[in-house]
């Protein structure tokens, strides 16, 4: 599988370098989160997640960084998500024709989003960052917009520093229509392993949806290959509850 797992050793440095931005694409307020990594595969050196504040539906992005220049493509559907971000391409991916073109600065980014005849300016302010590739560093409130979502909810992980480590302290469940947090799931996690398993940080929460159930899986670093905890949505209580086997 293309999405390799993180090293589980406590002393080993990780590979999460994440920067979060707030701003606008044209007249529309947006949030953007980007993770840099040289070895995503297929020539990809940056992956991320962004959403329009009005819609609250995260869109996966991927692309390349060259100096301060960033070029990002959007994932259109589940099939492309699996092909590009899960399995990986046998040949290097290209970014020609992709909508995002950004120039990164110390405090933010500017650029354009263009698709067909539509073209909008982008203005972004850096609001938070996370880096565990060396000594763990967290600046600001780092909230990761995970790729997984349902028709009703999106999910955001709040990452904090705990001693020499960084991990997800809690998971926020956001109602898309109400645009507000409707539940917070805290983790009894003395080892600081929550949300630290998958190479793309945005894949540390995954979903399973059937006709009568919605389950989210939270990934944890630990052991030889990591593990996950499943939370099932209760239609009676209108929240996610830990699924106990």
Q: What are these language model-derived features?
A:
Residues 8-11:
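N-terminal signal peptide c-region/cleavage motif recognized by signal peptidases
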